[in-house]
Amino acid sequence: MYCYLGKALLPSGAGPAALGSAGAALLGRARGQPAAAPQPGLALAAWRHYSEVVADRKDDPNFFKMVEGFFDRGASIVEDKLVKDLRTRESEEQKRNRVRGILRIIKPCNHVLSLSFPIRRDDGSWEVIEGYRAQHSQHRTPCKGGIRYSADVSVDEVKALASLMTYKCAVVDVPFGGAKAGVKINPKNYTENELEKITRRFTMELAKKGFIGPGIDVPAPDMNTGEREMSWIADTYASTIGHYDINAHACVTGKPISQGGIHGRISATGRGVFHGIENFINEASYMSILGMTPGFGDKTFVVQGFGNVGLHSMRYLHRFGAKCIAVGESDGSIWNPDGIDPKELEDFKLQHGSILGFPKAKPYEGSILEADCDILIPAASEKQLTKSNAPRVKAKIIAEGANGPTTPEADKIFLERNIMVIPDLYVNAGGVTVSYFEWLKNLNHVSYGRLTFKYERDSNYHLLMSVQESLERKFGKHGGTIPIVPTAEFQDSISGASEKDIVHSALAYTMERSARQIMRTAMKYNLGLDLRTAAYVNAIEKVFKVYSEAGVTFT
Protein backbone atom coordinates (compact mmCIF):
# COMPACT_ATOMS: atom_id res chain seq x y z
CA MET A 1 0.00 0.00 0.00
CA TYR A 2 0.96 3.59 -0.50
CA CYS A 3 2.57 4.62 2.79
CA TYR A 4 0.76 7.88 3.45
CA LEU A 5 -0.75 8.19 6.92
CA GLY A 6 -2.79 11.37 6.53
CA LYS A 7 -2.88 14.88 7.93
CA ALA A 8 -4.59 13.70 11.12
CA LEU A 9 -1.15 12.83 12.47
CA LEU A 10 -0.06 16.47 12.31
CA PRO A 11 -1.14 19.09 14.86
CA SER A 12 -3.91 21.43 13.75
CA GLY A 13 -2.54 23.88 11.22
CA ALA A 14 0.76 22.03 11.02
CA GLY A 15 2.73 22.30 7.83
CA PRO A 16 6.32 23.05 6.96
CA ALA A 17 6.79 24.82 10.28
CA ALA A 18 6.21 21.55 12.09
CA LEU A 19 9.51 20.37 10.68
CA GLY A 20 11.54 23.10 12.29
CA SER A 21 13.65 25.63 10.43
CA ALA A 22 15.76 23.06 8.60
CA GLY A 23 12.75 21.05 7.47
CA ALA A 24 10.88 24.18 6.40
CA ALA A 25 13.89 25.25 4.38
CA LEU A 26 14.00 21.88 2.67
CA LEU A 27 10.28 21.98 1.94
CA GLY A 28 10.57 25.49 0.54
CA ARG A 29 13.38 24.32 -1.65
CA ALA A 30 11.27 21.45 -2.97
CA ARG A 31 8.69 24.07 -4.00
CA GLY A 32 11.27 26.02 -5.94
CA GLN A 33 12.43 28.46 -3.24
CA PRO A 34 16.17 28.87 -2.64
CA ALA A 35 17.58 27.03 0.36
CA ALA A 36 20.87 25.50 1.37
CA ALA A 37 19.67 22.16 2.72
CA PRO A 38 20.58 19.16 0.54
CA GLN A 39 17.76 16.60 0.85
CA PRO A 40 14.25 17.99 0.23
CA GLY A 41 12.83 14.59 -0.65
CA LEU A 42 13.56 13.22 2.80
CA ALA A 43 12.18 16.24 4.65
CA LEU A 44 9.01 16.44 2.56
CA ALA A 45 8.42 12.72 3.02
CA ALA A 46 8.76 13.21 6.77
CA TRP A 47 6.30 16.12 6.83
CA ARG A 48 3.72 14.24 4.78
CA HIS A 49 4.29 11.06 6.78
CA TYR A 50 5.38 9.02 3.82
CA SER A 51 6.87 5.96 5.44
CA GLU A 52 10.60 5.48 5.22
CA VAL A 53 9.80 1.78 5.33
CA VAL A 54 13.40 0.64 5.49
CA ALA A 55 14.05 1.88 9.02
CA ASP A 56 13.63 -1.57 10.58
CA ARG A 57 17.01 -2.89 9.33
CA LYS A 58 19.03 0.12 8.31
CA ASP A 59 22.16 -1.80 7.28
CA ASP A 60 20.34 -4.71 5.60
CA PRO A 61 16.86 -3.52 4.60
CA ASN A 62 14.20 -5.65 3.01
CA PHE A 63 14.89 -5.19 -0.71
CA PHE A 64 11.30 -4.60 -1.80
CA LYS A 65 10.66 -2.17 1.06
CA MET A 66 13.90 -0.44 0.12
CA VAL A 67 12.50 0.25 -3.36
CA GLU A 68 9.20 1.36 -1.80
CA GLY A 69 11.11 3.81 0.37
CA PHE A 70 12.76 5.36 -2.68
CA PHE A 71 9.33 5.50 -4.35
CA ASP A 72 7.91 7.37 -1.34
CA ARG A 73 10.63 10.01 -1.56
CA GLY A 74 9.78 10.65 -5.20
CA ALA A 75 6.02 10.57 -4.56
CA SER A 76 6.27 13.12 -1.75
CA ILE A 77 8.07 15.52 -4.10
CA VAL A 78 5.75 15.17 -7.09
CA GLU A 79 2.36 14.86 -5.37
CA ASP A 80 1.53 18.58 -5.51
CA LYS A 81 2.31 18.72 -9.24
CA LEU A 82 0.15 15.67 -9.96
CA VAL A 83 -2.75 17.30 -8.11
CA LYS A 84 -2.24 20.58 -9.94
CA ASP A 85 -2.07 18.89 -13.36
CA LEU A 86 -5.34 16.98 -12.94
CA ARG A 87 -7.89 18.40 -15.36
CA THR A 88 -11.01 17.22 -13.56
CA ARG A 89 -13.98 19.11 -12.14
CA GLU A 90 -13.24 18.13 -8.57
CA SER A 91 -12.36 19.94 -5.40
CA GLU A 92 -8.76 20.17 -4.24
CA GLU A 93 -9.39 17.47 -1.66
CA GLN A 94 -10.98 15.14 -4.20
CA LYS A 95 -8.07 15.62 -6.59
CA ARG A 96 -5.56 14.88 -3.85
CA ASN A 97 -7.47 11.75 -2.87
CA ARG A 98 -7.48 10.65 -6.50
CA VAL A 99 -3.72 11.20 -6.79
CA ARG A 100 -3.00 9.29 -3.60
CA GLY A 101 -5.30 6.49 -4.69
CA ILE A 102 -3.50 6.03 -8.01
CA LEU A 103 -0.12 6.14 -6.27
CA ARG A 104 -1.36 3.36 -3.99
CA ILE A 105 -2.21 1.35 -7.11
CA ILE A 106 1.23 1.86 -8.64
CA LYS A 107 3.28 0.72 -5.67
CA PRO A 108 2.48 -2.95 -4.91
CA CYS A 109 3.45 -5.97 -6.99
CA ASN A 110 0.37 -7.09 -8.93
CA HIS A 111 1.17 -10.79 -9.37
CA VAL A 112 3.72 -13.18 -7.90
CA LEU A 113 3.96 -16.76 -9.20
CA SER A 114 5.75 -19.26 -6.97
CA LEU A 115 6.28 -22.71 -8.43
CA SER A 116 8.25 -25.92 -8.02
CA PHE A 117 8.86 -28.81 -10.40
CA PRO A 118 10.97 -31.97 -10.48
CA ILE A 119 13.86 -32.78 -12.79
CA ARG A 120 15.83 -35.97 -13.21
CA ARG A 121 19.54 -35.29 -13.00
CA ASP A 122 22.17 -36.97 -15.16
CA ASP A 123 23.15 -39.33 -12.32
CA GLY A 124 19.57 -40.61 -12.08
CA SER A 125 18.64 -38.73 -8.91
CA TRP A 126 15.59 -36.47 -8.68
CA GLU A 127 15.53 -32.88 -7.53
CA VAL A 128 12.76 -30.34 -6.95
CA ILE A 129 13.50 -26.90 -8.42
CA GLU A 130 11.94 -23.71 -7.05
CA GLY A 131 11.26 -20.64 -9.18
CA TYR A 132 9.40 -17.33 -9.11
CA ARG A 133 8.03 -14.76 -11.53
CA ALA A 134 6.77 -11.39 -10.30
CA GLN A 135 4.76 -8.95 -12.41
CA HIS A 136 4.80 -5.55 -10.78
CA SER A 137 2.62 -3.54 -13.14
CA GLN A 138 0.43 -4.00 -16.22
CA HIS A 139 -0.06 -0.29 -16.89
CA ARG A 140 1.84 -1.12 -20.08
CA THR A 141 1.97 -4.57 -21.61
CA PRO A 142 3.79 -6.80 -22.07
CA CYS A 143 5.64 -6.98 -18.77
CA LYS A 144 9.42 -7.09 -19.13
CA GLY A 145 12.20 -8.36 -16.92
CA GLY A 146 15.06 -10.80 -16.73
CA ILE A 147 15.40 -14.35 -15.45
CA ARG A 148 18.24 -14.99 -13.02
CA TYR A 149 19.67 -18.27 -11.78
CA SER A 150 20.94 -17.94 -8.23
CA ALA A 151 20.82 -19.93 -5.01
CA ASP A 152 19.95 -16.67 -3.22
CA VAL A 153 16.77 -15.97 -5.21
CA SER A 154 13.76 -15.11 -3.04
CA VAL A 155 10.23 -13.78 -3.45
CA ASP A 156 11.30 -10.45 -1.95
CA GLU A 157 14.13 -10.14 -4.46
CA VAL A 158 12.03 -10.78 -7.56
CA LYS A 159 9.31 -8.40 -6.30
CA ALA A 160 11.88 -5.66 -5.74
CA LEU A 161 13.53 -6.20 -9.12
CA ALA A 162 10.14 -6.27 -10.86
CA SER A 163 9.18 -2.94 -9.32
CA LEU A 164 12.54 -1.47 -10.34
CA MET A 165 11.84 -2.63 -13.90
CA THR A 166 8.56 -0.70 -13.96
CA TYR A 167 10.29 2.53 -12.94
CA LYS A 168 13.32 1.84 -15.13
CA CYS A 169 11.18 1.39 -18.24
CA ALA A 170 9.32 4.61 -17.44
CA VAL A 171 12.54 6.59 -16.96
CA VAL A 172 13.82 5.68 -20.45
CA ASP A 173 10.36 5.76 -22.11
CA VAL A 174 10.16 2.05 -22.92
CA PRO A 175 6.48 0.98 -22.97
CA PHE A 176 6.66 -2.08 -20.73
CA GLY A 177 5.45 -2.98 -17.27
CA GLY A 178 7.99 -4.39 -14.86
CA ALA A 179 8.59 -8.07 -14.14
CA LYS A 180 11.36 -10.38 -12.91
CA ALA A 181 11.98 -14.10 -12.53
CA GLY A 182 14.37 -16.21 -10.53
CA VAL A 183 15.22 -19.90 -10.40
CA LYS A 184 16.71 -20.98 -7.08
CA ILE A 185 19.80 -22.87 -8.28
CA ASN A 186 23.55 -22.37 -8.52
CA PRO A 187 24.11 -23.08 -12.24
CA LYS A 188 27.73 -24.11 -11.56
CA ASN A 189 26.37 -27.25 -9.89
CA TYR A 190 24.49 -28.46 -12.99
CA THR A 191 25.51 -29.82 -16.38
CA GLU A 192 24.43 -28.12 -19.59
CA ASN A 193 21.90 -30.89 -20.18
CA GLU A 194 20.41 -30.36 -16.71
CA LEU A 195 20.28 -26.58 -17.18
CA GLU A 196 18.42 -27.07 -20.46
CA LYS A 197 15.89 -29.32 -18.71
CA ILE A 198 15.39 -26.74 -15.96
CA THR A 199 15.04 -23.85 -18.41
CA ARG A 200 12.57 -25.60 -20.70
CA ARG A 201 10.46 -26.88 -17.80
CA PHE A 202 10.44 -23.44 -16.17
CA THR A 203 9.26 -21.97 -19.49
CA MET A 204 6.41 -24.48 -19.67
CA GLU A 205 5.36 -23.71 -16.09
CA LEU A 206 5.28 -19.98 -16.90
CA ALA A 207 3.28 -20.67 -20.07
CA LYS A 208 0.70 -22.82 -18.25
CA LYS A 209 0.04 -19.96 -15.83
CA GLY A 210 -0.04 -17.24 -18.52
CA PHE A 211 3.24 -15.67 -17.42
CA ILE A 212 5.01 -15.64 -20.79
CA GLY A 213 4.06 -14.48 -24.29
CA PRO A 214 4.92 -11.74 -26.82
CA GLY A 215 2.04 -9.56 -25.61
CA ILE A 216 1.89 -10.76 -22.01
CA ASP A 217 5.30 -11.12 -20.37
CA VAL A 218 8.70 -11.12 -22.09
CA PRO A 219 11.73 -12.38 -20.13
CA ALA A 220 15.38 -11.52 -20.84
CA PRO A 221 18.85 -12.51 -19.60
CA ASP A 222 19.97 -11.62 -16.09
CA MET A 223 22.42 -12.99 -13.53
CA ASN A 224 23.89 -16.35 -14.73
CA THR A 225 21.69 -16.49 -17.84
CA GLY A 226 22.43 -15.44 -21.40
CA GLU A 227 21.80 -16.14 -25.09
CA ARG A 228 21.81 -19.91 -24.59
CA GLU A 229 19.02 -19.91 -22.01
CA MET A 230 16.97 -17.37 -23.97
CA SER A 231 17.25 -19.56 -27.08
CA TRP A 232 15.93 -22.55 -25.10
CA ILE A 233 13.03 -20.45 -23.83
CA ALA A 234 12.13 -19.18 -27.32
CA ASP A 235 12.31 -22.66 -28.82
CA THR A 236 10.21 -24.19 -26.03
CA TYR A 237 7.50 -21.54 -26.33
CA ALA A 238 7.44 -21.56 -30.15
CA SER A 239 7.29 -25.36 -30.26
CA THR A 240 4.41 -25.67 -27.80
CA ILE A 241 1.94 -22.99 -26.75
CA GLY A 242 3.16 -20.56 -29.43
CA HIS A 243 3.01 -23.07 -32.27
CA TYR A 244 0.39 -21.05 -34.20
CA ASP A 245 1.72 -17.61 -33.21
CA ILE A 246 3.77 -15.93 -35.93
CA ASN A 247 5.27 -13.64 -33.26
CA ALA A 248 6.26 -16.53 -30.97
CA HIS A 249 9.97 -15.67 -30.93
CA ALA A 250 9.11 -12.25 -29.48
CA CYS A 251 8.28 -14.09 -26.22
CA VAL A 252 11.83 -13.46 -24.97
CA THR A 253 14.72 -11.10 -25.77
CA GLY A 254 18.48 -11.48 -25.53
CA LYS A 255 18.43 -14.36 -28.03
CA PRO A 256 21.23 -15.33 -30.45
CA ILE A 257 21.07 -13.58 -33.82
CA SER A 258 20.02 -16.81 -35.54
CA GLN A 259 16.99 -17.04 -33.25
CA GLY A 260 15.78 -13.49 -33.83
CA GLY A 261 18.20 -11.64 -31.58
CA ILE A 262 19.62 -8.21 -32.28
CA HIS A 263 23.16 -6.96 -32.73
CA GLY A 264 24.37 -5.00 -29.71
CA ARG A 265 22.17 -6.70 -27.08
CA ILE A 266 25.00 -8.46 -25.20
CA SER A 267 26.89 -5.23 -24.54
CA ALA A 268 23.77 -3.08 -24.13
CA THR A 269 23.67 -2.77 -20.33
CA GLY A 270 27.38 -2.00 -20.04
CA ARG A 271 27.22 0.43 -22.95
CA GLY A 272 24.24 2.08 -21.27
CA VAL A 273 26.28 2.46 -18.06
CA PHE A 274 28.98 4.20 -20.09
CA HIS A 275 26.50 6.57 -21.75
CA GLY A 276 24.86 7.27 -18.39
CA ILE A 277 28.18 8.30 -16.87
CA GLU A 278 29.12 10.19 -20.04
CA ASN A 279 26.05 12.42 -19.88
CA PHE A 280 26.79 13.55 -16.34
CA ILE A 281 30.60 13.61 -16.43
CA ASN A 282 30.49 15.98 -19.40
CA GLU A 283 28.09 18.34 -17.61
CA ALA A 284 30.28 21.15 -16.25
CA SER A 285 27.76 22.27 -13.62
CA TYR A 286 27.73 18.86 -11.93
CA MET A 287 31.48 18.42 -12.18
CA SER A 288 32.04 21.81 -10.53
CA ILE A 289 29.91 20.65 -7.57
CA LEU A 290 32.14 17.57 -7.28
CA GLY A 291 35.36 19.55 -7.76
CA MET A 292 36.20 17.61 -10.93
CA THR A 293 36.93 18.56 -14.53
CA PRO A 294 34.50 17.41 -17.27
CA GLY A 295 35.35 14.40 -19.42
CA PHE A 296 36.91 10.96 -18.97
CA GLY A 297 40.49 11.97 -19.75
CA ASP A 298 42.05 12.08 -16.29
CA LYS A 299 39.58 9.85 -14.43
CA THR A 300 40.20 6.56 -12.65
CA PHE A 301 37.51 3.98 -12.03
CA VAL A 302 36.89 0.75 -10.14
CA VAL A 303 34.51 -2.06 -11.18
CA GLN A 304 32.91 -4.44 -8.71
CA GLY A 305 31.74 -7.50 -10.64
CA PHE A 306 33.44 -8.63 -13.86
CA GLY A 307 30.39 -10.17 -15.48
CA ASN A 308 28.58 -8.93 -18.56
CA VAL A 309 27.80 -5.46 -17.16
CA GLY A 310 31.16 -4.93 -15.49
CA LEU A 311 33.17 -6.07 -18.51
CA HIS A 312 31.39 -3.90 -21.06
CA SER A 313 31.28 -0.87 -18.77
CA MET A 314 35.03 -1.27 -18.32
CA ARG A 315 35.59 -1.61 -22.07
CA TYR A 316 33.80 1.59 -23.02
CA LEU A 317 35.23 3.74 -20.23
CA HIS A 318 38.72 2.46 -21.11
CA ARG A 319 38.12 3.22 -24.79
CA PHE A 320 37.22 6.84 -24.00
CA GLY A 321 40.27 7.55 -21.87
CA ALA A 322 39.39 6.57 -18.30
CA LYS A 323 41.76 4.26 -16.42
CA CYS A 324 40.53 1.14 -14.62
CA ILE A 325 42.72 0.69 -11.55
CA ALA A 326 40.87 -2.15 -9.77
CA VAL A 327 38.41 -4.96 -10.42
CA GLY A 328 36.61 -6.98 -7.77
CA GLU A 329 34.92 -10.39 -7.93
CA SER A 330 33.35 -12.65 -5.31
CA ASP A 331 36.59 -14.64 -4.95
CA GLY A 332 38.91 -11.62 -4.66
CA SER A 333 40.07 -8.34 -6.16
CA ILE A 334 43.02 -7.07 -8.20
CA TRP A 335 44.69 -3.67 -8.36
CA ASN A 336 47.06 -1.80 -10.67
CA PRO A 337 47.41 2.00 -10.30
CA ASP A 338 48.83 2.14 -13.85
CA GLY A 339 45.65 0.67 -15.31
CA ILE A 340 44.16 -2.71 -16.26
CA ASP A 341 43.40 -3.54 -19.89
CA PRO A 342 39.86 -4.99 -20.19
CA LYS A 343 40.65 -7.24 -23.18
CA GLU A 344 43.69 -8.76 -21.48
CA LEU A 345 41.74 -9.35 -18.28
CA GLU A 346 38.81 -10.87 -20.19
CA ASP A 347 41.13 -13.28 -22.01
CA PHE A 348 42.81 -14.25 -18.73
CA LYS A 349 39.48 -14.96 -17.02
CA LEU A 350 38.23 -17.04 -19.97
CA GLN A 351 41.40 -19.13 -19.77
CA HIS A 352 41.68 -19.48 -15.98
CA GLY A 353 38.11 -19.02 -14.74
CA SER A 354 39.06 -16.19 -12.37
CA ILE A 355 40.67 -12.76 -12.38
CA LEU A 356 42.95 -13.77 -9.50
CA GLY A 357 46.51 -14.33 -10.64
CA PHE A 358 46.27 -11.82 -13.50
CA PRO A 359 49.97 -11.07 -14.12
CA LYS A 360 49.56 -7.34 -14.72
CA ALA A 361 47.90 -6.57 -11.39
CA LYS A 362 48.39 -7.28 -7.70
CA PRO A 363 45.88 -8.75 -5.24
CA TYR A 364 43.90 -6.03 -3.48
CA GLU A 365 43.47 -6.37 0.25
CA GLY A 366 40.32 -4.89 1.74
CA SER A 367 37.03 -3.83 0.18
CA ILE A 368 37.22 -2.87 -3.49
CA LEU A 369 34.27 -0.52 -2.88
CA GLU A 370 36.51 1.64 -0.68
CA ALA A 371 39.37 1.92 -3.19
CA ASP A 372 40.66 5.41 -4.02
CA CYS A 373 39.19 6.36 -7.42
CA ASP A 374 37.03 8.92 -9.21
CA ILE A 375 34.26 6.59 -10.43
CA LEU A 376 32.92 3.48 -8.71
CA ILE A 377 30.78 1.02 -10.69
CA PRO A 378 29.07 -1.56 -8.45
CA ALA A 379 27.99 -4.14 -11.03
CA ALA A 380 27.51 -7.22 -8.86
CA SER A 381 24.37 -7.51 -6.72
CA GLU A 382 22.06 -5.55 -4.45
CA LYS A 383 22.82 -3.91 -1.08
CA GLN A 384 26.60 -3.65 -1.51
CA LEU A 385 26.88 -0.04 -0.33
CA THR A 386 25.46 0.22 3.18
CA LYS A 387 25.52 2.43 6.23
CA SER A 388 28.63 0.55 7.39
CA ASN A 389 30.90 1.18 4.41
CA ALA A 390 29.41 4.35 2.86
CA PRO A 391 31.52 6.72 5.05
CA ARG A 392 34.70 5.07 3.70
CA VAL A 393 33.83 5.23 -0.02
CA LYS A 394 36.34 7.53 -1.74
CA ALA A 395 34.80 7.78 -5.22
CA LYS A 396 33.10 11.05 -6.22
CA ILE A 397 30.78 9.35 -8.74
CA ILE A 398 28.94 6.07 -8.17
CA ALA A 399 27.27 4.54 -11.25
CA GLU A 400 24.91 1.74 -10.22
CA GLY A 401 25.52 -0.94 -12.83
CA ALA A 402 23.76 -3.47 -10.59
CA ASN A 403 20.16 -3.26 -9.40
CA GLY A 404 19.76 -1.82 -5.92
CA PRO A 405 23.43 -1.77 -4.84
CA THR A 406 22.88 1.21 -2.49
CA THR A 407 20.73 1.06 0.64
CA PRO A 408 18.71 4.14 1.65
CA GLU A 409 20.99 4.82 4.63
CA ALA A 410 24.05 4.74 2.38
CA ASP A 411 22.25 6.98 -0.11
CA LYS A 412 21.71 9.60 2.61
CA ILE A 413 25.39 9.44 3.56
CA PHE A 414 26.48 9.93 -0.05
CA LEU A 415 24.25 13.01 -0.36
CA GLU A 416 25.70 14.44 2.84
CA ARG A 417 29.24 13.75 1.57
CA ASN A 418 28.57 15.40 -1.82
CA ILE A 419 28.99 12.17 -3.77
CA MET A 420 27.02 11.83 -7.00
CA VAL A 421 25.06 8.57 -7.32
CA ILE A 422 23.82 7.91 -10.87
CA PRO A 423 20.88 5.64 -10.01
CA ASP A 424 20.24 2.11 -11.20
CA LEU A 425 16.81 2.83 -12.68
CA TYR A 426 18.54 5.11 -15.20
CA VAL A 427 22.14 4.05 -15.65
CA ASN A 428 21.61 0.30 -16.17
CA ALA A 429 18.55 0.72 -18.40
CA GLY A 430 20.56 0.02 -21.56
CA GLY A 431 19.64 -3.65 -21.44
CA VAL A 432 15.88 -3.18 -21.42
CA THR A 433 16.16 -0.41 -24.03
CA VAL A 434 17.86 -2.70 -26.54
CA SER A 435 15.53 -5.55 -25.53
CA TYR A 436 12.71 -3.25 -26.64
CA PHE A 437 14.42 -2.84 -30.01
CA GLU A 438 14.76 -6.63 -30.32
CA TRP A 439 11.10 -7.14 -29.42
CA LEU A 440 10.07 -4.64 -32.12
CA LYS A 441 12.34 -6.38 -34.62
CA ASN A 442 10.64 -9.70 -33.86
CA LEU A 443 7.17 -8.19 -34.28
CA ASN A 444 8.16 -6.48 -37.54
CA HIS A 445 9.92 -9.61 -38.85
CA VAL A 446 12.66 -7.55 -40.49
CA SER A 447 16.06 -6.35 -39.30
CA TYR A 448 16.70 -2.66 -38.77
CA GLY A 449 17.75 -0.82 -41.92
CA ARG A 450 17.15 -3.64 -44.39
CA LEU A 451 14.40 -1.73 -46.19
CA THR A 452 16.30 1.57 -46.33
CA PHE A 453 20.06 0.84 -46.52
CA LYS A 454 20.42 1.10 -50.31
CA TYR A 455 17.89 3.90 -50.72
CA GLU A 456 19.68 6.09 -48.17
CA ARG A 457 23.10 5.35 -49.68
CA ASP A 458 21.93 6.21 -53.20
CA SER A 459 20.20 9.37 -51.93
CA ASN A 460 23.43 10.60 -50.34
CA TYR A 461 25.42 10.02 -53.53
CA HIS A 462 22.75 11.80 -55.60
CA LEU A 463 22.96 14.74 -53.18
CA LEU A 464 26.75 14.96 -53.62
CA MET A 465 26.39 14.79 -57.40
CA SER A 466 23.74 17.53 -57.34
CA VAL A 467 26.05 19.83 -55.35
CA GLN A 468 28.93 19.11 -57.72
CA GLU A 469 26.86 19.85 -60.84
CA SER A 470 25.51 23.07 -59.31
CA LEU A 471 29.03 24.33 -58.57
CA GLU A 472 30.26 23.41 -62.05
CA ARG A 473 27.38 25.34 -63.66
CA LYS A 474 28.03 28.32 -61.41
CA PHE A 475 31.73 28.53 -62.26
CA GLY A 476 31.49 27.40 -65.89
CA LYS A 477 33.25 24.13 -65.30
CA HIS A 478 32.14 20.79 -66.68
CA GLY A 479 33.13 17.16 -66.67
CA GLY A 480 33.89 16.67 -63.01
CA THR A 481 36.47 19.44 -62.63
CA ILE A 482 35.04 20.38 -59.20
CA PRO A 483 34.79 16.97 -57.53
CA ILE A 484 32.83 16.73 -54.31
CA VAL A 485 34.50 14.03 -52.22
CA PRO A 486 32.96 12.84 -48.92
CA THR A 487 35.15 12.74 -45.82
CA ALA A 488 36.19 9.36 -44.45
CA GLU A 489 33.58 9.60 -41.69
CA PHE A 490 30.80 10.53 -44.13
CA GLN A 491 31.93 7.76 -46.49
CA ASP A 492 31.54 5.22 -43.68
CA SER A 493 28.10 6.64 -42.92
CA ILE A 494 26.74 6.62 -46.46
CA SER A 495 28.10 3.16 -47.20
CA GLY A 496 25.24 1.91 -45.04
CA ALA A 497 24.72 1.76 -41.31
CA SER A 498 24.63 -1.74 -39.87
CA GLU A 499 21.95 -2.92 -37.45
CA LYS A 500 24.51 -2.54 -34.67
CA ASP A 501 25.14 1.10 -35.68
CA ILE A 502 21.41 1.83 -35.52
CA VAL A 503 21.06 0.12 -32.13
CA HIS A 504 24.06 1.96 -30.67
CA SER A 505 22.80 5.29 -31.98
CA ALA A 506 19.30 4.74 -30.61
CA LEU A 507 20.66 3.66 -27.22
CA ALA A 508 22.91 6.72 -26.98
CA TYR A 509 19.97 8.98 -27.85
CA THR A 510 17.73 7.29 -25.28
CA MET A 511 20.30 7.64 -22.50
CA GLU A 512 21.01 11.28 -23.38
CA ARG A 513 17.34 12.26 -23.50
CA SER A 514 16.61 10.51 -20.20
CA ALA A 515 19.63 12.15 -18.55
CA ARG A 516 18.37 15.58 -19.63
CA GLN A 517 14.96 14.81 -18.15
CA ILE A 518 16.58 13.84 -14.83
CA MET A 519 18.72 16.99 -14.82
CA ARG A 520 15.70 19.19 -15.49
CA THR A 521 13.72 17.54 -12.70
CA ALA A 522 16.62 17.83 -10.26
CA MET A 523 16.90 21.53 -11.10
CA LYS A 524 13.14 22.11 -10.95
CA TYR A 525 12.84 20.70 -7.43
CA ASN A 526 16.27 21.86 -6.22
CA LEU A 527 17.36 18.30 -5.56
CA GLY A 528 21.06 18.98 -6.08
CA LEU A 529 22.90 15.66 -6.42
CA ASP A 530 19.84 13.59 -5.47
CA LEU A 531 19.48 12.14 -8.97
CA ARG A 532 17.72 9.05 -7.66
CA THR A 533 14.74 11.03 -6.38
CA ALA A 534 14.68 13.00 -9.65
CA ALA A 535 14.56 9.74 -11.63
CA TYR A 536 11.77 8.36 -9.43
CA VAL A 537 9.81 11.60 -9.86
CA ASN A 538 10.04 11.22 -13.64
CA ALA A 539 9.03 7.55 -13.49
CA ILE A 540 6.10 8.19 -11.14
CA GLU A 541 4.79 11.03 -13.32
CA LYS A 542 4.81 8.85 -16.44
CA VAL A 543 3.22 5.79 -14.83
CA PHE A 544 0.67 7.99 -13.04
CA LYS A 545 -0.34 9.61 -16.33
CA VAL A 546 -1.09 6.22 -17.90
CA TYR A 547 -3.29 5.14 -14.99
CA SER A 548 -4.99 8.52 -14.74
CA GLU A 549 -5.86 8.81 -18.42
CA ALA A 550 -6.77 5.14 -18.89
CA GLY A 551 -9.08 5.25 -15.89
CA VAL A 552 -9.39 2.78 -13.05
CA THR A 553 -12.20 0.69 -14.50
CA PHE A 554 -13.17 -2.04 -12.06
CA THR A 555 -13.43 -0.13 -8.76
Swiss-Prot record:
Substrate binds at K81. One of its GO terms (cellular component) is mitochondrial matrix. Stoichiometry shows that ADP-ribosylation occurs in one subunit per catalytically active homohexamer. The active site is at K180. One of its GO terms (molecular function) is glutamate dehydrogenase (NADP+) activity. Homohexamer. This is Glutamate dehydrogenase 2, mitochondrial. It comes from Hylobates lar. The gene is GLUD2.
